């Protein structure tokens, strides 16, 4: 799915117009301080373009966290983002304490030319996601008439709509699909993300390698299935490798992750790989632990030896890393989704770190390397490799759904050209 037939910001006339822009400011926070401003920085080019081209105002809307439709300003307010934003484009930012309603509509109706306005968290209203929780924690559904009113109020805040929230593009939420304005364009971040993935999936450089990690096979079945039609090689690592190894090699895996649901489809996936001529690399050795704990006792195991009862594999070992590095060395394009060990804990981070070093090395020799958001993007931040690979996606779930071959509702809703 690409943006080739969708309106993009560079083709949108913003002069004298109020631009209402959906951004992804869902940033990690600690004690009301922003710990990683990557997503805020990523939105600046679109904001700056509007201001440089004479937009009357830019009204920014975003969610933060999962307040589930209940206002929680102490925990999930976007106010700290307003402070951070001021320092980036060096412009004053007006922060409003709500995102819809008469007062917000009034503030956005005729602002001073060149204003930047940030609305409060969209998810303080249950109408944004269409569902949430009440004060007692029970699930509630939004009233359809109120959803319509919420969307109508958002639509009054601008003359044209820009969506630059790639990280939320897989969600059919009100701010993503319900703003009713004549022109709806994709912002620069949305464009960059979709162009990278479109090229990677529609006309890849070959050999094309997918590195797939993470825990559950069942969660990644669609991903593996779709990628087996596109790639030349695939590394299957992380926790889900144990389900493959138990089914295929009858390996003893101790208390390592085993995905009962996913195990039923392992043989089908392997025969599809064989039919498509895709070379699959699985780990051959492991760093083990006597419990799921940062300070667990550490051991070693191989596929042949098996993992003893009561122990679990939490990282791949040096022989696996060698096999992975050979696959990386053969590739001209790599898409990586999911770490190959519990990288958050030093004792089990070596496999993912060694693989990251190889991917960086491949990038420097001209290989196209795409990191698919989520945990793998966190690895890049941790080891400072964000600018040493071709592209780090800002959207975990959205990039996963693109790699699964799905249509993203937030992109689908943009104006056609």
Swiss-Prot record:
The modification N6-acetyllysine is found at residues 11, 48, 75, 86, 91, 97, 131, 146, 199, 267, 291, 361. Mg(2+) binds at residues 215, 218-219, 375. Its cofactor is Mg(2+). GO terms for molecular function: ADP binding; ATP binding; metal ion binding; phosphoglycerate kinase activity; protein serine kinase activity. Residues 38-43 are annotated as: Mitochondrial targeting region exposed following cis-trans isomerization by PIN1 and recognized by the TOM complex for mitochondrial translocation of the protein. The modification Phosphoserine is found at residues 2, 4, 203. (2R)-3-phosphoglycerate binds at residues 23-26, 38-39, 62-63, 65-66, 122-123, 170-171. ADP binds at residues 214, 238, 343. Phosphorylated at Ser-203 by MAPK1/ERK2 under hypoxic conditions, which promotes its mitochondrial targeting. GO terms for cellular component: cytosol; mitochondrial matrix. AMP binds at residues 215-216, 220, 239, 313, 344. CDP binds at residues 214, 219, 238, 338, 340, 343. It catalyses: (2R)-3-phosphoglycerate + ATP = (2R)-3-phospho-glyceroyl phosphate + ADP; L-seryl-[protein] + ATP = O-phospho-L-seryl-[protein] + ADP + H(+). GO terms for biological process: gluconeogenesis; glycolytic process. The modification Phosphotyrosine is found at residues 76, 196. The modification N-acetylserine is found at residue 2. Catalyzes one of the two ATP producing reactions in the glycolytic pathway via the reversible conversion of 1,3-diphosphoglycerate to 3-phosphoglycerate. Both L- and D- forms of purine and pyrimidine nucleotides can be used as substrates, but the activity is much lower on pyrimidines. In addition to its role as a glycolytic enzyme, it seems that PGK-1 acts as a polymerase alpha cofactor protein (primer recognition protein). This is Phosphoglycerate kinase 1. It comes from Sus scrofa (Pig). The gene is PGK1.
């Amino acid at each position: 799915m690409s943006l080739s037939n969708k309106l993009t910001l560079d083709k949108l006339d913003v002069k004298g117009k109020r631009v209402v822009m959906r951004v992804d400011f869902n940033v990690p926070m600690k004690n009301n301080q922003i710990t990683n401003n990557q997503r805020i920085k990523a939105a600046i080019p679109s904001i700056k373009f509007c201001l440089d081209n004479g937009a009357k105002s830019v009204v920014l809307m975003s969610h933060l966290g999962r307040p589930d439709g209940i206002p929680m300003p102490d925990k999930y307010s976007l106010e700290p983002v307003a402070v951070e934003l001021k320092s980036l484009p060096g412009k004053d930012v007006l922060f409003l304490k709500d995102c819809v309603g008469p007062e917000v509509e009034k503030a956005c109706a005729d602002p001073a030319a060149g204003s930047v306005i940030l609305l409060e968290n969209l998810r303080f209203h249950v109408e944004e996601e269409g569902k949430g929780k009440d004060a007692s924690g029970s699930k509630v559904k939004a009233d359809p008439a109120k959803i319509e009113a919420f969307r109508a109020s958002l639509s009054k805040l601008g003359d044209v709509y820009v969506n630059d929230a790639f990280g939320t593009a897989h969600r059919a939420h009100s701010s993503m699909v319900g703003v009713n304005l004549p022109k709806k364009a994709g912002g620069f971040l949305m464009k960059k993300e979709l162009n990278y993935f479109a090229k990677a999936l529609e006309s890849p450089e070959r050999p094309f390698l997918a590195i797939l990690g993470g825990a559950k096979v069942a969660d990644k079945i669609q991903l593996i299935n779709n990628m087996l039609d596109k790639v030349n090689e695939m590394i299957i690592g992380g926790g889900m490798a144990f389900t493959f190894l138990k089914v295929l090699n009858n390996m003893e895996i101790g208390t390592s992750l085993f995905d009962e649901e996913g195990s039923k489809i392992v043989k089908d996936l392997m025969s599809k790989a064989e039919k498509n001529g895709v070379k699959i690399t699985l780990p051959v050795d492991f760093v083990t632990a006597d419990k799921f704990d940062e300070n667990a006792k550490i051991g070693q195991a191989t596929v042949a030896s098996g993992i003893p009862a009561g122990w679990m594999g939490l990282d791949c070992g040096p022989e696996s890393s060698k096999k992975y590095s050979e696959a990386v060395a053969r590739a001209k394009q790599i898409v990586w989704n999911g770490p190959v060990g519990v990288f958050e804990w030093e004792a089990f981070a070596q496999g993912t770190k060694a693989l990251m070093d190889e991917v960086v090395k491949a990038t420097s020799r001209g290989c196209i390397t795409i990191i698919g958001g989520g945990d793998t993007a966190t690895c890049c931040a941790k080891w400072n490799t964000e600018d040493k690979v071709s592209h780090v996606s800002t959207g975990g779930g959205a990039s996963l759904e693109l790699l699964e071959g799905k249509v993203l509702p937030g992109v689908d809703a943009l104006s056609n050209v």
